[in-house]
Amino acid sequence: MGSSRAPWMGRVGGHGMMALLLAGLLLPGTLAKSIGTFSDPCKDPTRITSPNDPCLTGKGDSSGFSSYSGSSSSGSSISSARSSGGGSSGSSSGSSIAQGGSAGSFKPGTGYSQVSYSSGSGSSLQGASGSSQLGSSSSHSGNSGSHSGSSSSHSSSSSSFQFSSSSFQVGNGSALPTNDNSYRGILNPSQPGQSSSSSQTFGVSSSGQSVSSNQRPCSSDIPDSPCSGGPIVSHSGPYIPSSHSVSGGQRPVVVVVDQHGSGAPGVVQGPPCSNGGLPGKPCPPITSVDKSYGGYEVVGGSSDSYLVPGMTYSKGKIYPVGYFTKENPVKGSPGVPSFAAGPPISEGKYFSSNPIIPSQSAASSAIAFQPVGTGGVQLCGGGSTGSKGPCSPSSSRVPSSSSISSSSGLPYHPCGSASQSPCSPPGTGSFSSSSSSQSSGKIILQPCGSKSSSSGHPCMSVSSLTLTGGPDGSPHPDPSAGAKPCGSSSAGKIPCRSIRDILAQVKPLGPQLADPEVFLPQGELLNSP
């Protein structure tokens, strides 16, 4: 009896050991998922989201480790590093980063900022996290990110994230500090040249490393999902690259910014609105950023349109890179925040998603999406018949031998009395930026003036020899760039479009503007539709 039981017990014991072994391998992932379910930060209404928030791309959590999904059987590998005060690298307990599947890792509220991106199986990711001790840096060594069966790759040499004063550049975008002294990166999406591809390329470090993630194009029926803006501008490296190529998209993007009335945590408190306004109402349109209080938040946009360079889409909103919100104020320099894309957008100002883009070797060129109808715009010409369409200012910045052609093949004429479209003389319409590399090479879309007979055509300030903008490589200003908020002062002079009309046409994302009257000049009433 005993001799016949021994083999059976041995077989049972073998199966039992195998079951225990399988359970031991599967338990960590299951436990991670279960803990993520028990304390789900995605249901927290106060949660600060990012373009690649795991609540949008997958499942994340705010505990000591991130959830794991997917499989590494396809040959993908992930190298992660974590530090809590310096540059020490290595994986700490439970600091795994989701790989292969759809899960990402982003953990506000813990003092850490996981910068990781999810892509299809077979691609390799690298994530790094570190505490936001100013002046310190956390780096991650790239243990070669191998992959098989995937078109996305990551060049895994050593890179580091520098935490400095109030903001830092992460490739094409900038990082924004959260209220818990951690940083989150909002990266500028750049589209590969193929218009049929929906793969997004995000710059991760200034050395040119990138992580590719497959994101579907924006769709109005998926309002809370990260997406690419469709074919936009392809570039890598610094925020304003050395050259651009437009692979599609001509429709306008409407961006409406709401200035919150109250001050934000970590920012010097001030009056409800920097320039007046009634209690309980949104602040009137803003014209500058030299205020030490308040915040600006994008509250409108269109997923039917393509994103402009420097903007990203998340949670039903279009965010300009480098912007801050009331819930996510800029720390370190509350007086004058740092912006990656110039000054903030004034309320009710509209922009063209198809800007005229310089093509030159210098990386110092910048694109300024100038709000229409704002200061610095001067009219030129007396309205006599002459050239139609945009004109370029006659200045030393535009050599006489420059070849500037419109989409119809006609050259852009210098701004003057013979032009039917107004212009901005040299030295006006420029913007200041925190980056010294963006001090020259500005191209600014300006509105049509009072003497314009071809309303809606913006003027441009040119500082490069060759301009590209349309899908065919020719300049193609968007007529809607000449629109401004309606008011009695603009009747018969400058074309205007009410915010209500704009938002009704573009199917806005995010909350509707409940009180469009605040965007009109003080004392004017909105005409009933």
From Swiss-Prot:
Glycans are attached at residue 172. Residues 58-83, 90-100, 111-175, 189-231, 392-408, 426-441 have a biased composition (Low complexity). One of its GO terms (molecular function) is protein homodimerization activity. Disulfide bonds: none annotated. InterPro entries: Corneodesmosin. It is found in: Secreted. The keyword Signal applies. Coiled coil: none annotated. GO terms for biological process: amyloid fibril formation; cell adhesion; cell-cell adhesion; corneocyte desquamation; epidermis development; keratinocyte differentiation; negative regulation of cornification; skin morphogenesis. Residues 449-467 have a biased composition (Polar residues). Keywords: Glycoprotein, Hypotrichosis, Secreted, Signal. Residues 1-32 form the signal peptide. Exclusively expressed in skin. GO terms for cellular component: cell-cell junction; cornified envelope; desmosome; extracellular region; plasma membrane. Residues 38-248, 383-492 are annotated as: Disordered. Important for the epidermal barrier integrity. It is linked to Hypotrichosis 2: A condition characterized by the presence of less than the normal amount of hair. Affected individuals have normal hair in early childhood but experience progressive hair loss limited to the scalp beginning in the middle of the first decade and almost complete baldness by the third decade. Body hair, beard, eyebrows, axillary hair, teeth, and nails develop normally. HYPT2 inheritance is autosomal dominant. This is Corneodesmosin. It comes from Homo sapiens (Human). The lineage of its organism: Eukaryota, Metazoa, Chordata, Craniata, Vertebrata.
